[in-house]
Amino acid sequence: MSSARYDRAITVFSPDGHLFQVEYAMEAVRKGTVAVGVRGKDVIVLGVEKKATAKLQDARSIRKIVKLDDHICLTFAGLTADSRVLISKALMECQSYRLTVEDSPSVEYISKFIAGIQQRYTQSGGVRPFGISTLIVGFDTDGTPNLYQTDPSGSYSSWKAAAIGRSSKSVGEFLEKNYTDVSEEESIKLAVRALLEIVESGNKNIEIAVIRNKQPIVLLDEQEIDKLVAVVEAEKEIQKEQEKSEKQQK
C-alpha cells in the first residue's frame, strides 16, 4: 500500500502509527490566529488575536469569543467555518441539557461533548477532521473556575493557562514561565502580555473576555484594551531598564 493512500484515508493508520488527516487538521490549527486562556483565583480570561478586517468589512460581525451558556464561553483557533458547525452543536447540547436535566451543564461536560464530536470525525468515512482547537471556560455551580482545551484528535484536558493557534508553543512557554494563581487584574495583564509576545500592539488586533462567577461575560472595549496594552508596554520597558542596570553593575 503506497504512502499516498495513508495520506488520503482518514481511517487508515500509516505503518508508523500516524493518522495523517488528523495531523493536517492540527497543522490548520497552528496556522490559525492565536488564542490564550488564563485561569485566576476567581476569574477566567480569554484573549484572542483578531485578523485585520477589510476597509469595508464590519469588524463587529467577526467574533472569536462565543457564549455557549450563561456561565460557559468558547474561543478557537483554526478554520472559522469548521468552528461554526461545532459551536452550533455545542449550543444545541447546552439547550437540550437544560430542558432534559433542568440544570446548567458543567464546563467539563460540554468540553467532553465537543471533544467527542471531534473524535468521531477522525474515524468515520465520508468526513474529515475538524480543523480547529478550542478553549472552553466557565465556572461550576460551586464557583470553581475551569479552563479546558480540545484538539482535532478529540482529546480534551484541563489547564491553568493555555495557548492555541500560531506560535502557541512559544506563547505556552511564556505562560508557563510567568503564570501564578493570581488576582483578576494580574490574570488579565498576563493574557495581554502573552498575546503581545507575537501580536502587533493595538486594540484592533486583540479581543479580551473576562468571565466572573455568576456574572455576565464581559468583553473589554477598545479603550480598556488600549489602557491595558499601555500598562503592559510600560512594565516591559521598566523591566528592560532594570535588567540593563543589573548587567552594568556586574
Swiss-Prot record:
Keyword Cytoplasm: yes
Provenance organism: Dictyostelium discoideum (Social amoeba)
Highest taxon above the source species: Eukaryota
Name of this protein: Proteasome subunit alpha type-7
Keyword list, A-Z: Cytoplasm, Nucleus, Proteasome
NCBIfam families linked: PRK03996.1
Cellular component per GO, a single term: cytoplasm
Family: Belongs to the peptidase T1A family.
